[in-house]
Each structure stands twice: as C-alpha cells, then as structure tokens.
C-alpha cells in the first residue's frame, strides 16, 4: 500500500455521512449497498446470463441421494442459499450445501442444522497481510455482517493459512473471502479454497 492514498482511511462511515450531509450530498442518506457496485440495480441472474451460458443440471438431496429438481446453472447458487431454489415441495428448509462442477449437480439438504452445512476449518489462500501481527487466536468473518467467529490460525506459508473453528460454522463457502481481526484491527484477508 505504499503508492495508494485513502483520503477517508482515518474516519468511520457515520462521520463520512455527517460530512456528506453538511455539504448537501445525496449520498449522505443513501442506503448502504450489499450488492455488486459495478452492476448497479440490475438482476444478478440476468447480469450473469449476459456473459455466461446457462448450463442446467439436476438438484440432489445429499442425504437421500434422490433427485429433487433441476437447476438453471451452478453459477446462480451459493452455499447456504435457501431462497430461489425453485425445486417445489416443502423447500422452506432446504439449503444449498454443495456443487459438483464436473457432474453439474447442485446438492441440497433439509434443515438449518444439517451436518452438510457445517464446517470446522478452512484453507485460506491468496493472503493479503495488512499487519505484521500473526496471532494464533483471533476473530474471523466469512460473510458480510456476520458476527465475529473465534478461530485458531495455523500459518502454513506466506500465502496460505488454516483457520480452525471447532464450534462449527454454517455455509463457509470456497471462493469467498475470509477476513481476520485482532480486536478491532483487520490483520489479513484471503480466499477460502476448501472447507473441512
């Protein structure tokens, strides 16, 4: 970060909003965004379909191994998702628990506490260290607005760590981010490669 300048780096969002309000900027009262900023207020599935071809396949209940429906393309589903599965029947408590990219199968499981939703450790790669600190115990976030998760960290090399959370965490998803904090300080971030 030697050649990067963050003009708002020392102040928090409430103060930024206050300053924006004082200058009469419309962003002062704009709702926070949790989507992908560069696609705007468009339908995410529609956006993806403009660039990637749909590849329909089957949906399988991972517990019974039975086909329970069809999907429109694995790219549209995330681990832990329960809405928008469109597989009919009593799907209020059906959750996406896995994807087989080679066979084009979407796996679902019944119940919020299903063992297939839980993992207990994750291999994190592409590490971006934001601090010289390398604690063995700290807090992690695997999703936006998720409560802090107490974790143990094993530093494998300069680019890989193993994050352990013996209490189990739902829907930790390969391809998404893991961010570690020591108290209020963000110490590193990386990409979830695999969960165990």
Regions found by a protein language model. Give the residues of each.
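Nucleotide-activated chemistry modules centered on ATP-dependent adenylation/adenylyltransferase
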Residues: 1-187, 191-196
